[in-house]
């Protein structure tokens, strides 16, 4: 796919819808609280503008909009079936403060929707081509207000290496299967078969068992788009931050595991990481290595 192309060609999410969910870590109240801990003055959640890129069927955004009728919420997704369902749900809930648009992120500018206090992109960044990732970061740079907060989730190394083993096994085993749900079921069945084999080394079996236990918690549709996706690119934390800084974005904090929560580590580990880290970004990277996150 070339940089002058958009994402509209053969979009798999119009074939199999991605199951949306409520994401507590993206709620503007939570994001504002984290920002205040670090000395920022974010817009109050009850009077703000929120943009969600890749909003899916709108479950997360409709939930937020329902709680804050004086705030404005905008959801963008490329899949038409997602937007249709999001609009239907918003109408059934009687929401007047949320809007959903079928839109390619490559076509969005400041003139399209204006500026925002909070921008969310969950389950998007690692599953799009490089030029789209660049566009997403540029939107955060261009569309966030001065005290605006951006939330981006992505698959992270080194932990993603363990997941990659299972993903590659599933992809190889199902390489000739075209039907999405059949592909997922065959892939799951193959991994389950491997977890039952005692011939493989114990470490391999333990890793595969752990990943399989996590895998089967999710709907088949989510597994299809996450584990069997053509594009699924993890990043080291420092790699992502370097790309973000090219777009004038600054790391503030993890949304769930705050960098200040060092109680998980023994004192000697904390001291060692502080001695070899020049900043919080490097400290976070060392922590990821230690936890294989």
Which positions does each model-derived feature cover?
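Conserved SAM/SAH-binding beta-strand->alpha-helix loop
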Residues: 79-81
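Conserved SAM-binding loop of SAM-dependent methyltransferases across substrates and taxa
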Residues: 57-70
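Rossmann-like AdoMet/SAM-dependent catalytic core
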Residues: 202-293
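Conserved alpha-helix/loop element of class I SAM-dependent methyltransferases that forms part
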Residues: 15, 19-48, 63
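Conserved SAM-binding strand-loop segment of SAM-dependent methyltransferases
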Residues: 94-106
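A short glycine-rich, Lys/Arg-flanked "PGG" loop and its adjoining helix->strand segment in the class I
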Residues: 134-146
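A short acidic, Gly/Pro-enriched loop at the edge of an enzyme's catalytic core
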Residues: 110-119
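Conserved class I S-adenosyl-L-methionine
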Residues: 149-182, 186, 190-200
């Amino acid at each position: 796919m070339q940089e002058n192309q958009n994402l509209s060609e053969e979009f798999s999410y119009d074939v199999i819808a991605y199951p949306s969910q409520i994401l507590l870590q993206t709620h503007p109240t939570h994001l504002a609280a984290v920002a205040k801990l670090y000395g920022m003055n974010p817009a109050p959640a009850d009077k703000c503008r929120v943009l969600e890129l890749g909003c899916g069927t709108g479950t997360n955004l409709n939930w937020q909009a329902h709680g804050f009728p004086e705030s404005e919420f905008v959801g963008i997704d490329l899949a038409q079936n997602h937007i249709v369902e999001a609009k239907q749900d918003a109408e059934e809930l009687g929401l007047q403060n949320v809007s959903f648009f079928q839109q390619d992120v490559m076509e969005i500018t400041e003139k399209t929707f204006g500026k925002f206090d909070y921008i969310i992109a969950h389950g998007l960044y690692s599953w799009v081509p490089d030029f789209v990732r660049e566009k997403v970061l540029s939107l955060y740079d261009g569309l966030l207000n001065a005290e605006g907060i951006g939330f981006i989730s992505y698959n992270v190394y080194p932990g993603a290496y363990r997941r990659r083993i299972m993903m590659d096994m599933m992809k190889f085993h199902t390489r000739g299967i075209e039907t999405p749900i059949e592909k997922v079921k065959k892939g799951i069945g193959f991994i389950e078969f491997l977890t039952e084999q005692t011939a493989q080394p114990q470490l391999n079996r333990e890793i595969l068992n752990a990943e399989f236990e996590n895998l089967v918690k999710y709907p088949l549709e989510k597994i299809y788009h996450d584990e069997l996706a053509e594009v699924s690119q993890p990043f080291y934390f420092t790699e992502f931050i370097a790309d973000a800084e090219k777009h004038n974005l600054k790391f503030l904090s993890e949304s769930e595991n705050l960098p200040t929560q060092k109680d998980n580590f023994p004192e000697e580990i904390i001291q060692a990481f502080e001695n070899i880290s020049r900043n919080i970004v490097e400290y976070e990277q060392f922590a990821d290595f230690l936890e294989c996150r």
